[in-house]
């Protein structure tokens, strides 16, 4: 007998394209005349592509974002002598570095960090325009603005890393370079410089909310998949009539841990855990160097960590190795 399994999407319903709700008179038209469907996307979610509403904010966001990506990309290409083969071979190690400490908050020459400043400006404008677009689209649809404010939490962390903290520290060299491995190297050097971020309480909270959000998402996703044979994935119907799917899902968690979330509260829990991850992370980064110079010594002072004897020679301050040389 075949067993019902739905870890991967098995069934696609091919129906007529949905054009969306009517737009207000003052809005620009949607992009794309006729939506189309892609079977592979239907295995992950809705197979329909379009129509897309860009509007002036969306178009400007894409323009500024494209300029930022081009500046970063061409600088990386220039760093390998305009060799496309080396560009792809070394891509994960290439970077566009911030200015060196000697420039402080001044405008440096383009090749000494000026390109980094320009790319960061364009990227920030692009992200903020996209946020405004998300907010206005939610309002136009009569929705709440929960998605926009969740995105704002991520923007907060981005601005702390690349703008707010460098300004408070008085140097653009404190910011993160553009690049995959280089930004990871920056993170490791940052932790070493400020005495191990593991002793930063806001870093600990950020990781707790990160793992918590992952756990909640896994619990919620697994529960809905487990009762989808009873129609549990049709949440609109379940709100009006809990039916056997929601009853079984809630009964399962009451049986296993003595408590169950509701169809609404699980989403509120997940939203808060996900939002608090970058919010706490941004606070922890912002306090490093501005308020606390060494998180390990801070932890020793407050009885969080033991005091270890000095065995090895002091390491070189990573701050002296950052920025464009």
From Swiss-Prot:
Keyword Coiled coil belongs to the record: no
UniProt xrefs under InterPro entries: Photo_II_D1/D2_sf, Photo_RC_L/M, Photo_RC_L/M_CS, Photo_RC_M
A Pfam family recorded for this sequence: Photo_RC
Binding site for (7R,8Z)-bacteriochlorophyll b: 183, 203
Annotated binding of a ubiquinone, by residue: 253
Chain positions recorded as Fe cation binding sites: 220, 235, 267
Subcellular location: Cell inner membrane
GO cellular component term of the entry, any: plasma membrane
Gene3D superfamilies: Photosystem II protein D1-like
Principal subcellular localization: membrane
GO biological-process terms attached to the record: photosynthetic electron transport in photosystem II
Membrane topology, record value: Multi-pass membrane protein
A molecular function GO annotation: bacteriochlorophyll binding
Transmembrane feature ranges: 54-80, 111-140, 143-168, 198-226, 260-286
Keywords noted in UniProt: Bacteriochlorophyll, Cell inner membrane, Cell membrane, Chlorophyll, Chromophore, Electron transport, Iron, Magnesium, Membrane, Metal-binding, Photosynthesis, Reaction center, Transmembrane, Transmembrane helix, Transport
Family assignment from sequence similarity: Belongs to the reaction center PufL/M/PsbA/D family.
Subunit description: Reaction center is composed of four bacteriochlorophylls, two bacteriopheophytins, two ubiquinones, one iron, and three highly hydrophobic polypeptide chains (designated L, M, and H).
Protein task: The reaction center is a membrane-bound complex that mediates the initial photochemical event in the electron transfer process of photosynthesis.
Name of this protein: Reaction center protein M chain
Lineage summary: Bacteria, Pseudomonadati, Pseudomonadota, Betaproteobacteria, Burkholderiales
Gene it is expressed from: pufM
